[in-house]
Amino acid sequence: MKIYKADFITSGVNPEHYPEPLLPEVALAGRSNVGKSSFINKLVQRKALARTSSKPGKTQTLNFFNINDEVMFVDVPGYGYAKVSKTEREAWGKMMEKYFTTREILKGVVLLVDIRHEPSADDVIMYDFLKYYDLSVIVVATKLDKIKRGQRDKQIAAIKRKLQFDGQDTFIPFSSETGEGVDAAWEAIYRHL
């Protein structure tokens, strides 16, 4: 896919902060440091459109990115970071729940999980939440380059089993280092628009 435009538009906490609903939206969710920003940057062929950090919990708002005037990516705060206060975690949870349940132009959610590990309890809760609200889900297993080729099928099966993966959803192994999975991710995203 040729990317001719990839712009950060705004950050928001409440609906009044969201941009006008002019483009279909695809949200990106996952644990802190699972690679959401790296995923965005690899898809749009930029090094720093979405800021990456080695420190978990950096994203604290909904961040909206206009891609080619065709789709809006919405990077949501990572979950599961223990050093964030309970009050802050609850506020993030309410912010994300409000977005996921009220944003009519939300066409799907990319749920990123680390292929090296079984999904956490938080990953399972997020997947179940998205399915409960009948949202289309693309599960992207990041950090594919960090495991041996012979381990891939085993890890994919373990992730699908733990999530109780719905066969109607899409599953994509992905590496922001090698670019493996980029084309499959774009195809899945465009199927949901």
UniProtKB/Swiss-Prot annotation:
State the family it belongs to. Belongs to the TRAFAC class TrmE-Era-EngA-EngB-Septin-like GTPase superfamily. EngB GTPase family.
Its taxonomic path starts at: Bacteria, Bacillati, Bacillota, Bacilli, Bacillales
> What does the record list as GO biological process?
division septum assembly
Co-factor(s) = Mg(2+)
The UniProt keyword set, sorted, is: Cell cycle, Cell division, GTP-binding, Magnesium, Metal-binding, Nucleotide-binding, Septation
* Protein name, entry field: Probable GTP-binding protein EngB
Output the HAMAP family linked to this UniProt entry: GTPase_EngB (MF_00321)
Q: Which GO terms describe its molecular function?
A: GTP binding; metal ion binding
- Report the SUPFAM superfamilies cross-referenced here: P-loop containing nucleoside triphosphate hydrolases (SSF52540)
Q: Where does GTP bind?
A: 30-37, 57-61, 75-78, 142-145, 174-176
Carries keyword DNA damage?
no
The EngB-type G domain covers which part of the protein?
22-193
The organism is Exiguobacterium sibiricum (strain DSM 17290 / CCUG 55495 / CIP 109462 / JCM 13490 / 255-15)
GO cellular component terms attached to this protein's record: cytosol
**Role, per record:** Necessary for normal cell division and for the maintenance of normal septation.
